């Protein structure tokens, strides 16, 4: 069976306060806005992956819970991201932590409107090849 010819991924997250969510994505995480649809704003997280912030009243889904998704951002600058989040006043549910068994740095925090976010950096050489292919 042939693989789908997938070129990217967008995760859409639904918000009651779209401007506050957009401020978080742009000014806290530092993500560039690549598509403004008015009620949906799409931010680039890597060359072919994106996060979309959607006005809950206009989106295609009737998102009723915020604890059904964990948005995990794979970074190559974990310590810098930690400091950026600290400077923005975020508290961490978990971490920052180094997992000896997984060979990752990880931290979790609650973002806008109660959504859970994880920031992680893979440290094992084999996993770095998988998750950081553009750094070769």
Where does each model-flagged region fall?
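Vicinal oxygen chelate
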Residues: 1-4, 86-136
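Conserved active-site tyrosine of GNAT-family acetyltransferases
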Residues: 21-26, 85, 114
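Conserved short beta-strand elements that form part of the metal-binding/catalytic scaffold
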Residues: 31-66, 109, 116-122
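Short secondary-structure junctions
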Residues: 30-36, 91-96
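N-terminal beta-strand motif that seeds the catalytic metal site of vicinal oxygen chelate
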Residues: 1-22, 69-73, 123-136
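Residue-level preference for beta-strand/loop junctions
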Residues: 7, 65-67, 101
């Amino acid at each position: 069976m042939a693989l789908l010819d997938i070129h990217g991924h967008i995760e859409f997250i639904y918000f009651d306060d779209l401007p506050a969510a957009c401020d978080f994505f742009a000014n806290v995480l530092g993500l560039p806005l690549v598509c403004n649809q008015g009620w949906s704003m799409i931010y680039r997280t890597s060359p072919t992956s994106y996060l979309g912030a959607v006005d809950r009243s206009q989106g295609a889904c009737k998102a009723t819970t915020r604890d059904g998704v964990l948005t995990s951002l794979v970074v190559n600058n974990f310590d810098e991201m930690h400091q950026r989040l600290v400077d923005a006043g975020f508290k961490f549910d978990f971490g920052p932590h180094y997992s000896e068994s997984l060979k990752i740095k990880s931290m979790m925090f609650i973002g806008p409107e109660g959504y859970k976010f994880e920031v992680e950096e893979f440290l094992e050489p084999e996993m770095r090849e998988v998750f950081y292919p553009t750094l070769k």
